[in-house]
């Protein structure tokens, strides 16, 4: 997605340790027009997947997930990082955050993730695939089917895609970062695998 790639190169910031900061347009302050185009592309990519529910994890996945849900006319549910006192019938798993260097016990109400669901997971980043693996675990607990996973940005050098594809998950990323070596952002061309 050329518009996204240009924005990453223009406004993305690189930090040592493989960190790409896009908080000025994706995951703190959001460019709503860019987010709409992102959602349109995910809706196009997964139009024939049979998805009936969008799932994300708080917090940065919520905005794109809501937009995808709106365009596809589907409900959106987000996995919570803190258990509400009011949540019953809960499914839980542990997810490690790469950027925050900590584990979270995340949860979702089984009322909102069931064996009738064919879910599309939407998130801002795919790095090592930790959040995505957590979603797979929750889906398995609920006997829900994952029809695909869509990521705004993938850091290919952290190999999250391979781990997901080994489990038979369809992965679509709108911008694939090949390298952040020497804090230089290298984005894959459309024709690269």
Curated annotation (Swiss-Prot):
Positions of 5-phospho-alpha-D-ribose 1-diphosphate binding: 127-131
Catalytic reactions of this protein: XMP + diphosphate = xanthine + 5-phospho-alpha-D-ribose 1-diphosphate
Known EC number: 2.4.2.22
Subcellular location: Cytoplasm
Binding site for xanthine: 20, 27, 155
GO molecular function, one term: xanthine phosphoribosyltransferase activity
Keyword terms, alphabetized: Cytoplasm, Glycosyltransferase, Purine salvage, Transferase
CDD domains, per database record: PRTases_typeI
Enzyme class: transferase
Biological process annotations from GO: purine ribonucleoside salvage; xanthine metabolic process; XMP salvage
Record text on subunit structure and interactions: Homodimer.
Task performed by this protein: Converts the preformed base xanthine, a product of nucleic acid breakdown, to xanthosine 5'-monophosphate (XMP), so it can be reused for RNA or DNA synthesis.
Similarity comment: Belongs to the purine/pyrimidine phosphoribosyltransferase family. Xpt subfamily.
Protein's name in the database: Xanthine phosphoribosyltransferase
Naturally occurring in which organism (per UniProt): Porphyromonas gingivalis (strain ATCC BAA-308 / W83)
Highest classification ranks of the organism: Bacteria, Pseudomonadati, Bacteroidota, Bacteroidia, Bacteroidales
